[in-house]
Amino acid sequence: MRYYTTLTLLITCMVIGLTGCRRDGIPTGGEGNTTEESKQTDLRILEVYYAGSEYSRVVNGQRFGSDYDDDAFIKIYNPTKEVKYLDGMLIATGSLDPAANIEVTATDGSSSGTADYYLKNFLVGSMLLFPGSGTDHPVQPGTAVIIAKKAIDHKAAFAKELGEDVGSYDLSKLIDLHQAKYSWTEGSGEIWVHEVFNASGIESSEEAANAWDPEEMSPFSISGKMALALIRPTVEINKIKEAFLQECKLPASDRGKAVYYRDVYFKSTHHSSRQVGLLLPNDQVIDAVVICPMKEKKMQILNLSLDKGFHGVKQTSEDKRPTYAGKSIVRKWDGKGFVDENNSTSDFEVKPVNPTTTIIRD
């Protein structure tokens, strides 16, 4: 009997082969031990710190608090077993507000019907471009990088700016980002991830070129009501820009066939509006998260394959500053890997900001 038992165990171990077998006969790999992280094939958004922190000042015995949002950042993580490169990648914000009670229409006519192109593509509101020729900006397996609004020690910089008046201020909650390698503000950080497109406030095709003009575009920012995406485009950004600028000159009747340019029409209960947008294919989006107060989402602004949910550090827009200051939305760790089911409601949680590239698994 012992001979057959031993033989059976040996055969079992041989069958599972590549998955491994412990000395006691229990498999060490295989489907039962597959983690979410092991299924991920590209970079992921790990943390988004967008609502900022706070500082206070005591005047005549009274404490007055203030917002501070120059310390925003995005943390990107490599869950794979191979080096990934940021060169030529885009960080993009969506053009639609998930908390808005609106309907996107096909044209500016109130009875033109609902449009769904923004679900078939990522409708870009603004975007940053990583520099590099292909292998200049690696992210090693199991490591993270921070892309900061300003890669500085915010407490030290603000204290220096205040000078002799610093004694009446409490700056203890401001964070140190001086070690962040990447920054979207020129002059801070080792590498400038510069803004290449921003359609904010641009409402017509005649003004569309301004979305690509550094002198005209609004500064890149992360709000509490938007989609945020990491995009690996298959077409060089200069070619996208060239095509967009040609398409915006098409007759209005032909613009619906454009690849990149889009007149975005939407209506609410009381009025209709128009803005300019840039379309990029969903299959070039390698990760996305919808940011929204937890009790305010009204509109699905991304294809469900990109994000079925949403997350935010606030419950409502009226939350008091102390309830959200110094907090991020962070991808959950399930004990095996960082969760990624393309559902930000369950994939993310609210945690105190971690302004370092140290990976916290808890």
Regions found by a protein language model. Give the residues of each.
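Bacterial N-terminal signal peptides that target proteins for export
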Residues: 1-8
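C-terminal motif of bacterial Sec signal peptides marking the signal peptidase cleavage site
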Residues: 17-20
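A structural motif detector for short, solvent-exposed N-terminal "entry" segments of globular domains
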Residues: 23-100, 198-272, 333-335
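Residue-level detector of short, conserved catalytic/binding motifs and their immediate flanks
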Residues: 43, 72, 87-89, 143-145, ...
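Acidic glycine-/aspartate-rich tracts in secreted/extracellular proteins
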Residues: 80-81, 150-154, 234-236, 282-285, ...
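Intrinsically disordered, low-complexity Pro/Gly/Ser/Thr-rich segments with frequent PxxP/GP/PP motifs
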Residues: 101-157
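Acidic, glycine-rich loop-and-strand cores that form catalytic or ligand-binding grooves
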Residues: 165-317, 324
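Extracellular low-complexity, O-glycosylation-prone Ser/Thr/Pro/Gly-rich "stalks"
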Residues: 301-362
